[in-house]
A protein has these predicted regions:
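Solvent-exposed segments in extracellular or luminal domains encompassing
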Residues: 1-16, 95-107, 174-183, 252-253
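Conserved structural position at the C-terminal beta-strand
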Residues: 21, 111-113, 188-190, 272-274
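Short, exposed coil/turn segments at beta-strand boundaries within extracellular/luminal domains
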Residues: 24-30, 114-123, 168-170, 191-200, ...
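Proline-enriched interdomain boundary motifs that mark the N-terminal boundary
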Residues: 40-48, 131-138, 204-208
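A short beta-strand segment in extracellular, disulfide-stabilized domains
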Residues: 55-70, 145-155, 219-224
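Solvent-exposed loop segments of extracellular immunoglobulin-like
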Residues: 68-82, 86, 156-167, 230
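Short beta-strand segments within Ig-like beta-sandwich modules, predominantly Fibronectin type-III
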Residues: 87-95, 165-178, 246-250
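Short loop/turn motifs at secondary-structure boundaries
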Residues: 198-291
Length: 291
């Protein structure tokens, strides 16, 4: 009799096997065997990715494969799938519970218990992720507290991009709506951790009033968010249409004076000619001077 007893349940501990020999309808004697069932190592590799500069091919962020075992009686042998021969090649000097992968591919670890000689293998796949390189922001609906910022990433990379406004919650959409006037920070990342880009964006608006009384608070009237690229010209008028002041859009603003003299508290009108997304635009409105 020559047979192999296989324990398919993987029950740990001691197992009793009863073996009865038979020949035709004739049964022989029964022999009992006590077999010790040792636990198998249970490596648990997790699929991951490496970050690679697409233009240079250089890996700038490796991925650490972890067998997630710490038994001092375990040894580790690491392999990588050779896609030409479809066999696993041993990775030299890779004998720890972790391995730092710098190339994409399928990896395998064989863990051996040196006391019981039980061994188990596990595999994981490591893929390449190329980062996004840069992005541009387009602001529409200026002069409102309901502006829209649209983000365009180029090159987009291969990661799953997410977007954040002013350090707020991450979102999958590249469009932010209802954005208030002022300076904002846009952050673009990917969920794989290969991309991290930031940029400041200005949303244009104007203060509805100012109080030029020298207390350092709202002493100047100035349009918020204008930059040199807007090529803006700002004109301030009184209620009769008389030009009071032309102000520098990048300067401090208007101090509430005409020819060096304070002028009355009342409403004043302004006109701003500017460029938004390569289109010439004009905006008119009024604000209050309060003393």
């Amino acid at each position: 009799i020559n047979d192999v007893l296989v324990n398919t349940s993987n029950v740990q501990g001691f197992v009793k096997y009863s073996v009865t020999s038979k020949l035709g309808n004739c049964a022989g004697g029964t022999t009992e065997y006590i077999v010790r069932v040792n636990p198998l190592p249970k490596p648990d590799l997790i699929d991951g990715h490496i970050c690679v500069n697409e233009s240079t091919g250089v890996t700038y962020q490796a991925y650490v494969l972890d067998a997630q075992l710490a038994d001092p009686n375990f040894t580790y042998d690491w392999f990588m799938l050779n896609t030409v021969t479809n066999t696993y090649d041993a990775l030299p000097s890779a004998n720890g519970s972790t391995y730092e992968a710098t190339q994409p591919g399928t990896y395998q670890v064989t863990v051996t218990n040196t006391v019981t000689n039980c061994k188990q293998t596990d595999q994981a796949t490591v893929i390449t992720v190329y980062p996004a390189i840069a992005f541009t922001s387009i602001v529409t609906e200026a002069f409102t507290n309901d502006a829209t910022i649209t983000i365009t990433v180029n090159p987009v990379g291969t990661g799953s991009l997410i977007y954040s406004l002013d350090g707020g919650a991450w979102q999958n959409s590249n469009i932010f709506t209802g954005v208030e006037a002022g300076t904002h920070q846009i952050t673009v990342e990917d969920t794989e951790g290969c991309t991290h880009l930031t940029e400041t964006v200005e949303v244009i608006d104007y203060p509805k009033y100012f109080t030029p009384n020298g207390d350092g608070i709202h002493d100047y009237w100035k349009i918020v968010g204008l930059e040199a690229k807007h090529n803006a010209k700002i004109y301030i008028f009184d209620r009769y249409g008389k030009l009071i002041k032309q102000i520098d859009p990048l300067g401090d603003g208007w101090d509430g004076k005409y020819n060096g003299q304070n002028i009355p508290s009342t409403d004043y009108w302004f006109k701003v000619d500017y460029t938004e997304n390569n289109q010439q635009k004009q905006f008119k409105a009024h604000f209050s001077l309060k003393r």
